[in-house]
């Protein structure tokens, strides 16, 4: 509760200390900025909104549905022109967005879908299934199509976690000599990725690879492997973070990841919000998929802030 109050106070102070731009206010709400993916979303959306002449409020719900509800309510009370949201849950988010819509505040979702259409104006998400297949194909290649491996799963309430896992197994399960010896949830967390990897490694010392539902967990797994002297174990992630880029280029355990373009996705959401505010339409379907890109040693140098340069 104290954290919630602190966030709301910060949001209120931010609103009161800005001089509003002519175009009004856009609220940008994401999960915790401790995760560089979500920070890239927030930074990308903020940059584009201010470039287009809007004042911005940036806040994090920390994957807490109640906190998210309060932040959306605050955005509505501040008469925001639009909300850019990476939500705290596909089901629990619907009610708050329905209230925002009824109050005339349109929502533009990024990264995570909700389980209802017609509530948000746009849902712009990565093609998680396609990206997971890219990661899995590279993982199988790096593993030589055989060996014991581990899968680290994301937060169970996040549909992206299950979609990515399904994409992984659509590819990996075609190879009978690939043997999954452990599958554990690490909740998108680097700390949990480290602790899960430590315990899994003790129980399964012969593992050859780790495939992870995001880069943050992959980095935690890599740290545990390094601490155990296991530089031989292959790790493949998902997201396209700069930290993973650095590991790939340095020849660390992490060999590849699937880039989901957080920066570009967030900026596109703001562009669509601006068009909707001005014209009443984005000119696009509500649900939009952005394909992921495989990142490995061949192109990692071009990666910066979840965006790949030409």
From Swiss-Prot:
GO cellular component entries: periplasmic space
InterPro entries: Peripla_BP_I, SBP_2_dom
Stored Gene3D superfamilies: 3.40.50.2300
Keyword entries, A-Z: Periplasm, Signal, Sugar transport, Transport
UniProt-annotated location(s): Periplasm
Ligand binding (D-apiofuranose): 35, 111-112, 158-160, 164, 214, 239, 260
Annotated signal sequence range: 1-21
Chief place where the protein resides: periplasm
Domain of life, source organism: Bacteria
One of the record's GO molecular function terms: carbohydrate binding
Database matches in Pfam families: Peripla_BP_4
Protein purpose: Part of an ABC transporter complex involved in D-apiose import. Binds D-apiose, D-ribose and D-ribulose.
Record-stated family: Belongs to the bacterial solute-binding protein 2 family.
Protein name stated in the entry: D-apiose import binding protein
